[in-house]
């Protein structure tokens, strides 16, 4: 994940967004030691950005972490009450935040940079009338056979969809974020020079009542949408995505794939309309 910092030196407010594969890479088991090792590698690039004088906020995906928590929930359901998905979202945001925070702290000490770092557990408001709730598409958790899927659908109200090769999985909504609850304090901390880790895994999805009260909802917010919304609110000038690939590709994964180093907004929209970028991809 090498990074040329020349493009960001003039930007005073920068968001660095870590993809889920920056913490747990393809083919790995996802052990804590692997996650720390991967985070340490990502933090080398992040420390270069910090040394260039940028004020940064870090967001990150929760990759397989929240799914693994969900699997642990189900495996121990006979022993302890399983937690709802939004609590699993919060758990993964906290644990991955710690891994990134500690790794960056150690990296900055190694290169003699003094900056405070904090992880902010972030709630993200979603609209209960979002069409994503009518047609859940985001798969989470383990695979089940057809009989188990029918029982879970009946007893817990889960929406189950079949993967033709591996069985049935629960699918949940992935609504668009409309407000970042902690955006104000995130902005203030960043302006004071604190490196803030926020909106991990897209944040914890919540619904806001007419009285302004919040309640969690079982959903998964796309990390990139949450990052873009947060960037707008804190007035970030640059968003940098650190991922497992070196750039955006047209016809990705095919023999004719072609790298795209720069594109206009118009070109990006045209690529989207042509289906070049799969849902959930970078």
For every predicted segment, state its role:
Residues 22-24, 63-67, 125-128, 204-206, ...:
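Short, active-site-adjacent cap segments at secondary-structure transitions
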Residues 76-196:
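Ligand-binding beta-strand-loop-alpha-helix segment within the catalytic cores
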């Amino acid at each position: 994940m090498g990074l040329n910092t020349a493009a960001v030196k003039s930007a005073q407010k920068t968001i660095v967004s870590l993809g889920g594969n920056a913490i747990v890479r393809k083919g790995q088991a996802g052990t804590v030691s692997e996650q720390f090792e991967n985070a340490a590698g990502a933090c080398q690039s992040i420390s270069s950005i910090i040394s260039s004088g940028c004020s940064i906020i870090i967001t990150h995906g929760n990759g397989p972490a929240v799914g693994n928590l969900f699997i642990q929930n189900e495996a121990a359901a006979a022993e302890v009450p399983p937690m709802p998905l939004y609590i699993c979202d919060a758990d993964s945001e906290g644990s991955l935040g710690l891994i990134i925070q500690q790794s960056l702290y150690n990296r900055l000490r190694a290169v003699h940079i003094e900056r405070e770092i904090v992880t902010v557990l972030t709630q993200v408001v979603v609209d209960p009338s979002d069409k994503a709730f009518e047609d859940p598409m985001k798969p989470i958790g383990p695979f089940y056979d057809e009989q188990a899927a029918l029982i879970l659908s009946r007893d817990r109200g889960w929406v189950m969809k079949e993967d033709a090769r591996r069985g049935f999985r629960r699918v949940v909504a992935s609504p668009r974020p409309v407000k970042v609850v902690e955006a104000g304090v995130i902005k203030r901390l960043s302006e004071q020079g604190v490196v803030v880790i926020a909106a991990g895994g897209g944040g914890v999805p919540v619904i806001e009542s007419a009285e302004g009260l919040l309640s969690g909802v079982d959903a998964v917010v796309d990390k990139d949408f949450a990052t873009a919304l947060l960037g707008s609110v804190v007035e970030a000038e640059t968003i940098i995505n650190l991922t497992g690939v070196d750039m955006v590709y047209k016809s990705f994964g095919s023999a004719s794939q072609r790298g795209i180093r720069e594109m206009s907004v118009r070109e990006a929209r045209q690529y989207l309309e042509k289906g070049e970028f799969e849902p959930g991809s970078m």
